[in-house]
């Protein structure tokens, strides 16, 4: 209303342009205001979908978790993720991924965030980051037969959240070398 009082209608062409600009601005403000209800509704639906696959504490819509997962070592930031999921077991992941897809969320798997590729940086505000840091099971080196390879090959089972130093140490104990980038061996996750 105050803007209308200040409009100069003496130049009809200019006034028409101002009118269009005001129309676009009002529409943008209404869309922005409506986005809060839409985001809240999506959060409710997503939380309900995630609830049958993981504990509620593993579903993080809070600002701290979301900002902490907005980038990797590149410090390149595009968007803040919609939600951060931190499953307790690998068995939870298929259901969480399915729930993300059904909710229209882009899925981003993330380890320790030490990468320099930007591959874990959300490019849309509707991204779900699945943090694998709690998935820490580590087996021992065992010989395995692999298709197309003669003889047995030393293998080591790890879950996605195992810190590389632990893998390197397990290989060393078994008499093998697991080559790593030592600058981040204590932070980098398999």
Regions found by a protein language model. Give the residues of each.
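Noncatalytic alpha-helical scaffold of FAD-dependent oxidoreductases
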Residues: 1-190
């Amino acid at each position: 209303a105050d803007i209308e009082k200040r409009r100069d209608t003496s130049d009809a062409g200019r006034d028409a342009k101002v009118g269009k600009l005001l129309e676009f601005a009002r529409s943008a403000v209404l869309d922005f205001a409506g986005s809060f209800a839409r985001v809240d509704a999506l959060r409710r639906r997503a939380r309900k979908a995630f609830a049958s696959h993981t504990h509620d504490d593993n579903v993080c819509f809070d600002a701290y978790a979301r900002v902490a997962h907005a980038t990797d070592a590149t410090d390149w930031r595009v968007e803040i993720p919609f939600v951060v999921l931190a499953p307790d077991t690998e068995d939870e992941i298929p259901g969480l991924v399915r729930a993300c897809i059904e909710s229209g969320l882009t899925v981003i798997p993330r380890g320790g965030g030490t990468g320099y590729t930007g591959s874990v940086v959300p490019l849309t505000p509707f991204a779900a980051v699945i943090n694998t840091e709690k998935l820490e099971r580590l087996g021992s080196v065992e010989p395995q037969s692999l298709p197309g390879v003669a003889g047995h090959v030393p293998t080591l089972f790890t879950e996605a959240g195992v810190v590389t130093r632990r893998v390197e140490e397990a290989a060393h104990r078994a008499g093998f070398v697991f080559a790593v980038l030592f600058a981040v061996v204590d932070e980098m996750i398999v």
